[in-house]
Every structure is written in C-alpha cells, then in structure tokens.
C-alpha cells in the first residue's frame, strides 16, 4: 500500500490544552509518528487547502501542520515519495513535493521516514516494461532498481533518517507476492533492494513493511524469509507491521493477542519491530475483507455506514478501551519496539472513510474531525506518565 509535544490547538479563537503529548509521554519507549500528505504542508504555507498528488482532500488542512509539529516527533509522507510521483518516467525525477515535505519536517526537528522505495503498487508504469510494452529482463530490472534507489536515497542522504525499502512483498498466507518484481527477479529483488539502499546511505535505517502482520501465517512467512538473510548480514534494521485494524475483529482481544505474538516472532529474528500505519476502523467489515490491499473495493450500503451522524457512547467507550488495551500490550514489549506511527492525522482525512467502501464516515484516528485529541489519548498517556521521572531517557 508502510509521529506528539504539548497539545495546544487553535480552532478559531479557542484553544484546547493538554498537559502532555503521546510523543513526550512515550519518549523513553519509542518514537511516535504520523503520516503526512503534501497538502497539509502546502496548506500551512499558503493559508489555503491544496489537493495532494492523488487529488484527495477532506476537511480543513490549514492548521494540520502546526498540530503535527506540536504533537509528533516522526513523520512519513503518505504519497509524495512514492515511485509514481518522484520517478514518473525513466530518467525523470521530480523531488519538488518530497523536498518540501522533508525540509518542513527537518525544520521542525522531526525524524523522517521515506515511504517507499520498492512497492508493486503506485510504481510508475514504465518500470517493468520496455518500449514495446514487454517485460524487461532480469538485468534491466536490476539496473533500473539500483539507479532508482541510488538516486532517491542519495538525494535525501542526511535528511531522511529511515526508509521503507520494500513494502508489502508477501501474501497473507506467508508466500511471496507475485508482483512484477517477483515475476522477473524472484525473491532476489528484496535483498537487492536492501543492498542498494545501504550502499547509497550506510547510515540510514532500512525497514521491511507489510499489512496483516497480525496473522500468524503471514508474520511467520516473512520472518522465515528474512531469517537467513539477516544471519548473513543483510542490513535490515527492523521489520514493520502496518496495523490497519478493524474493531469488530477484536473479539476477546484476539487482534491484540495476535500482535503480541507477532512482536515476539519478529524479536526472535534479533531485530526490533514498529507499527507503521496504525488506525482502527469502527465500521462493519465487508464479508471476506481483511488486510489493506488497496485493490479490494466494495459497494456502499447504509447498513455498512452506521455512524454517519456520530458515534454512540457505547461505541466510543469500546474504542477507548481497545486503544488502552493495545497500548498496554505495546508497553509490555517496549524493548522490541522502535516506533509507533499513526496513519492520517484526524478522522476527516483518514483513508478509512473511503476504504474499502467509498463515502462512509469512520473514526479511525486519535484526533476527531475538529482536530481535537480524543479522550483515550489522555488515558494512554496516563499508562506511563507517573513513570517518566524514574526511567532512563531513551528517545530524544
């Protein structure tokens, strides 16, 4: 498909103040991040809303960047660093949007993740084909991959701290995804991508990232693939789990228990993990749907959009309890987690409103449609706040 300080928000002439942000509260544990779309930066710079590279826009983004800078210490671009944007044609690179995003983030003192170097989706159409429309040879694709990765990583060297090197390379059953990269290069494309990225910037952290990593078959398949490569010295800093969750799936805390297992499975490789794209859909799940494959789409029906006019108190309480329980699980694994990253700043611009059913009203993020932190944010902070004076500072 793969970031919080004092909560002081301006909405009109009013302000809502929270004593401490998640990033501050959890600075001894991990980085706390969020995904950012280019229009959030552009709206801040121009004072008006802008469309992102996909044409999507929702809500008022003119204050988003201020909230992001106040409340997160790690950011990732949702779209503007992907292949179809920065490398749309062979030999043609456009870093305009990506540079603007990275420069803005570094000026605010935040760490930056580049997302993503090699991904079958949103890869420019020319990448795998020759001028006659036929698949290129192994050697041509390796050359294109190397040039693509070297050029992008070198351009951002010293500014981008980490990269999602390969994104979504496995199916839910733990077998390699039969993408065009796989069809031409087999699974060799994965270690080659890490090799090229490390050569281009030896100091950058390098990640593998995927969805449905709560499923035992998938996380075990991914780890089975990476184990010998890591043992042979492949520069893999961490294995990431996206964490696109659905509330109704969490019967008896089953989703949380699955992620508990997955963290242990990855830790057994000798590398840490991170959550790269956390959100929680509270809407009914279409039959047969799971994961975050962006090609999965379903038709709209009113019964699949029950909270169009707002959540019930019971549903709000259920959501709050989920996040508290989820964070309790994360805290128990604090030595094996390096980052907890949320996908989209607020409910208004969450992709969940349009995936996998377009036009619904979801409540998937930590901030409401007015950019106010939801009640569970303080509850999550309270899990560790009393400990801050006794723990050694781990994250600056």
Regions found by a protein language model. Give the residues of each.
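Sec-dependent N-terminal signal peptides
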Residues: 4-13
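N-terminal carbohydrate-binding accessory modules
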Residues: 19-74, 88, 386
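Noncatalytic carbohydrate-binding groove/subsite architecture in carbohydrate-active enzymes
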Residues: 24-27, 37-58, 180-300
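Acidic (Asp/Glu)-rich catalytic clusters
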Residues: 25-27, 62-73, 99-111, 153-157, ...
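Structural preference for beta-strand elements that scaffold enzyme active sites
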Residues: 29-33, 74-76, 111-113, 160-164, ...
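Substrate-binding cleft and catalytic face of glycoside hydrolase catalytic domains
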Residues: 38-39, 70-88, 97-214, 282-286
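Alpha-helix N-cap and loop-to-helix initiation/capping positions
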Residues: 90-96, 132-144, 179-189, 217, ...
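Aromatic-rich peripheral "rim/lid" segments of glycoside hydrolase catalytic domains that contact
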Residues: 155, 164, 169-184, 196, ...
């Amino acid at each position: 498909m793969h970031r919080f300080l004092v909560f002081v928000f301006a909405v009109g002439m009013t302000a809502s103040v929270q004593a401490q942000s998640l990033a501050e509260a959890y600075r001894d544990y991990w980085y706390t991040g969020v995904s950012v779309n280019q229009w959030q930066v552009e709206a801040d710079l121009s004072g008006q809303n802008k469309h992102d590279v996909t044409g999507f826009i929702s809500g008022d983004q003119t204050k988003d960047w201020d909230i992001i800078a106040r409340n997160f210490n790690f950011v990732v671009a949702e779209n503007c660093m992907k292949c179809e944007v920065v490398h749309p044609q062979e030999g043609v690179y456009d870093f305009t949007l990506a540079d603007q995003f990275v420069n803005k983030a570094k000026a605010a003192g935040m760490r930056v993740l580049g997302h993503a170097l090699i991904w079958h989706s949103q890869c420019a159409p020319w990448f795998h084909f020759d001028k006659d429309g036929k698949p290129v040879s192994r050697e041509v694709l390796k050359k294109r991959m190397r040039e693509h990765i070297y050029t992008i990583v070198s351009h951002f060297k010293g500014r981008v701290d980490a990269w999602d090197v390969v994104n979504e390379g496995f199916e839910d059953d733990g077998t390699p995804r039969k993408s065009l990269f796989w069809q031409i290069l087999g699974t060799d494309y994965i270690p080659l991508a890490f090799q090229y990225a490390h050569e281009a910037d030896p100091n950058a952290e390098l990640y593998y990232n995927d969805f449905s990593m709560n499923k035992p078959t998938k996380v075990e398949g991914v780890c089975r693939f990476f184990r010998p490569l890591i043992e042979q010295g492949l520069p893999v800093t961490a294995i990431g789990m996206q964490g696109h969750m659905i509330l109704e799936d969490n019967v008896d805390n089953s989703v949380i228990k699955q992620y508990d297992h997955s963290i242990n499975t990855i830790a057994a490789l000798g590398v840490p993990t991170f959550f790269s794209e956390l959100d929680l859909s509270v809407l009914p799940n279409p039959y047969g749907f799971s994961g975050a494959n962006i090609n999965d789409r379903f038709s709209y029906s009113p019964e699949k959009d029950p909270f169009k006019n707002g959540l019930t108190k019971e549903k709000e309480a259920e959501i709050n309890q989920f996040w508290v329980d989820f964070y309790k699980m994360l805290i128990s694994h604090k030595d094996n987690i390096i980052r907890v990253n949320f996908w989209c700043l607020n409910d208004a611009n969450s992709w969940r409103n349009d995936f996998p059913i377009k036009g619904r009203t979801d409540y998937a993020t930590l901030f409401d449609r007015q950019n106010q932190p939801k009640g569970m944010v303080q509850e999550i902070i309270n899990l560790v706040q009393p400990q801050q004076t006794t723990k050694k500072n781990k994250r600056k």
